Amino acid sequence: MQNLQIREKLALDIILFGKICFPNMFSTESPPFHYEIAALLQDSNNNKLNIIAPRGHAKSSLIACVFPIWHMLTQEGPKFIVLSSKTEGHAVRLLQTIKNALEYSAELRSIYGYWGQHSAKQWARTEIVLKDDTMIMCR
């Protein structure tokens, strides 16, 4: 399968995007509710969502890491993404997960090119500005 075909397929499926680009985050089978969340996230009619699930069910991995990167790489134009959490420390950890994924995922790099620190316009503790002017910040 050629790179463009892979990108087109991944643009339609957040879970598949995560499994391919971040295999270490998807080491077990995704439960059915992850597919429900993904469908809600992919529906452009939903501009506000409140997802509630027990601790340890990979909500943050899917919603605060995989989805922002998927959205950034599969939808046109620069994005403004705010990682909001109860504490700034938790939001910073979420951003660090994104930064690690952008910097170190060989799978992501092979499909979308390099999006890590050396191509970014800003790469700070609480915010990053990527090469396409997408900004991801903590609050």
Where are these regions (language model features)?
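N-terminal accessory segments
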Residues: 1-47
